[in-house]
Curated annotation (Swiss-Prot):
Protein name: O-methyltransferase aunE
Key word NADP present: no
Example of a GO MF term: O-methyltransferase activity
Short name of any one Pfam family annotated for the protein: Methyltransf_2
PROSITE patterns registered for this protein in UniProt: SAM_OMT_II (PS51683)
Organismal lineage: Eukaryota, Fungi, Dikarya, Ascomycota, Pezizomycotina
Top-level taxon: Eukaryota
Function, as annotated: O-methyltransferase; part of the gene cluster that mediates the biosynthesis of aurasperone B, a dimeric gamma-naphthopyrone. The first step in the biosynthesis of aurasperone B is the production of gamma-naphthopyrone precursor YWA1 by the non-reducing polyketide synthase albA, via condensation of one acetyl-CoA starter unit with 6 malonyl-CoA units.
Enzyme class: transferase
Record EC number: 2.1.1.-
Catalytic residue positions: 299
Recorded family membership: Belongs to the class I-like SAM-binding methyltransferase superfamily. Cation-independent O-methyltransferase family.
Keyword Transferase attributed: yes
InterPro entries: COMT-like (IPR016461), O_MeTrfase_dom (IPR001077), SAM-dependent_MTases_sf (IPR029063)
Length: 386
């Protein structure tokens, strides 16, 4: 039965509308980040119009593409306006990233200040509203064209399908990271990974709070036997946090950063080692380490690729070795990142049961696990001894 014509929109309808119309507004986030609109608004320090923000931007950065001008015909007059900044600031206000005041005036709020004070968060926002939004736009098209072939496999996701349909045949065969490298986006992504959207404390603090006895593990091991291998460790922030917490135990030779990311650069405080675990013939080069770490690595991988990587680590683990995995707890709070991993990487966040299945396929068993309602879970695996 149709609702009466004069009936107000029900709360459920408002919820649906406000949620599904987010995507177009999110498309403006990269503009705000690219032109540092959050930083400009915060530095102004008081309510400001879009023109005020543009003027401040010009003073700080000089002439940029922000100043492309639109001429609007209004009756018999032409008005010169900058619609890019005005619409972008308005939509950032709609998303809650700044405050909307009457008469097209904008003001920094707590979210604005967080974005300015946490540069990695702005780079993360750019990533999910660029690569992530592109992939989501082509999800249904990819499914329909393949008769709903699912789950996706690595390098064959809606992200690659988007590039295929746009005529970028070379990029359509590449991994997301390779595409970001070729398009100049990888350095931004690496910056995101150093701090993400903010973290509580250091890695030792976080695992300690969840009940994992990292202190006891390191202190009960002879110094000459301590080696920590961070697989896919980016710019080494996890190892550097461990070094700062245990300076008497962890020196450069104890800390091994394994990466194949082309834009990482030099991390002088740790031992850098290239390892592309994607290559079938490339085995884990460090045997018998005390601790192998994977932080936000496996959620980028499909189950098949995860098992391959876990097997490579399992084969070189000693009976005393630990594999420590840190990912988001899979629940409603992480459902959006779960979707992002599926669409861009064919990966996923995982539950305890899913981690146990992966471990079993790789000859490993879970010996510690903790799943907080928000933030990172911690899963320790050890080799199954026959």
């Amino acid at each position: 039965m149709a609702a009466p014509q004069n009936a107000p929109i029900p709360e459920a309808g408002k919820k649906v509308m406000s949620t599904v119309t987010l995507a177009p507004a999110l498309g403006f986030v990269p503009i705000a980040v690219h032109f540092d609109l959050f930083g400009c608004l915060q530095e102004i320090g008081k309510p400001a119009t879009a023109q005020d923000v543009c003027n401040f931007h010009h003073t700080k950065y000089g002439d940029t593409d922000l100043f492309s001008i639109t001429f609007l015909h209004n009756k018999s007059m032409f008005a010169k306006v900058n619609r890019t900044s005005d619409d972008t600031l308005f939509l950032m206000g709609g998303l809650g990233f700044l405050d909307l005041l009457p008469d097209d005036v904008y003001q920094a709020n707590a979210v604005t200040r967080f974005l300015v004070d946490t540069p990695s968060a702005q780079h993360g926002a750019m990533h999910f509203t660029s690569e992530g939004l592109l992939a989501s736009a082509f999800l249904m098209r990819r499914l329909m064209d393949t008769k709903f072939e699912y789950p996706f496999q690595e390098c064959d996701t809606p992200f690659q399908y988007a590039h295929k349909l746009m005529g970028n045949d070379h990029l359509a065969r590449e991994h997301v990271y390779s595409v970001m490298h070729e398009t100049g986006r990888l350095d931004s992504f690496n910056t995101f990974m150093t701090g993400k959207f903010g973290r509580w404390g250091t890695m030792p603090d976080r695992v300690r709070k969840l009940g994992y006895d990292l202190d006891g593990l390191l202190q009960s091991t002879a110094p000459e036997r301590i080696r920590v291998v961070d697989i896919g460790g980016g710019r080494g922030e996890l190892l550097l946090e461990m070094q700062a917490t245990y300076p008497h135990l962890l020196k450069k030779e104890n800390l091994i950063l394994q990466e194949y990311n082309a834009d990482i650069g030099v991390v002088p405080e740790v031992t850098e080692m290239g390892w592309n675990y994607k290559e079938d013939a490339s085995e884990q080069p460090v045997k018998g380490a005390l601790l192998y770490s994977m932080a936000h690595v496996l959620h980028n991988l499909s189950d098949i690729e995860s098992i391959k990587l876990l097997n490579k680590v399992s084969r070189v683990m000693a009976p005393s070795s630990r594999l420590l995995i840190q990912e988001f707890t899979k629940n409603a709070a992480s459902s959006t990142t779960h979707a992002a991993m599926i669409l861009m990487h064919a990966g996923r966040e995982r539950t305890s049961a899913e981690w146990r299945d992966l471990a079993a396929f790789a000859g490993l068993e879970i010996t510690f696990e903790a799943y907080p309602p928000n933030g990172e879970c911690v899963v320790e695996m050890r080799k199954v001894l026959n």
